[in-house]
Amino acid sequence: MPPMKDSSNSTPRTDEELQEVTVGELKPHNASITLLEYDPRWPKLFDREAKRIRSVLGNKALQVEHVGSTSVPGLCAKPIIDILLVVTDSADETTYVPDLEKVGYTLRIREPDWFEHRVFKGPDTDINLHVFSKGTSEIDRMLRFRDWLRANNSDRDNYARVKRKLAQHEWRQVQHYADAKSSIVQEIMKRANAT
């Protein structure tokens, strides 16, 4: 899941709040976060999944992008490929969910109050497929953050330091780890948006 909707609020979402947006059972993590050094195979895994998504959705897949830490060379990451999928209307699940399910994707998150965001788990690779509607501001934010970290080693390295420090803690939910990164993400985005 992405950082908290209101990233100025450092209070992690409760299990009840997370269960509200989770499709199926919310299972606690209750462990530290595993981060791996950058793996050059990650872009290849993305390419394979992007082809799978495009093959089943055709022109309904308006944009398919590799996002998140695995998309930034030199950045440590949870070994989960984050993919951004842009469709015409993410709330209209009938237009894309059955097709994604045919190739093994499973809907896990439905956030109607946050840009109609959806998250699917991948069929045979650790994948978080984030689905947004065309024109949603979060699309630009995700791409700008990725591109900024790719081009700015000092921010990439600072982000990695914060991630490593936070990853050592035990987190009840993985989302709490993501929420804890909100302040560093905001700090970096201020610089990215100033250009």
Swiss-Prot record:
It holds the Pfam family GrpB. InterPro entries: GrpB/CoaE (IPR007344), NT_sf (IPR043519). Residues 1-21 are annotated as: Disordered. It comes from the Bacteria. Belongs to the UPF0157 (GrpB) family. Residues 1-12 have a biased composition (Polar residues). This is UPF0157 protein BH1888.
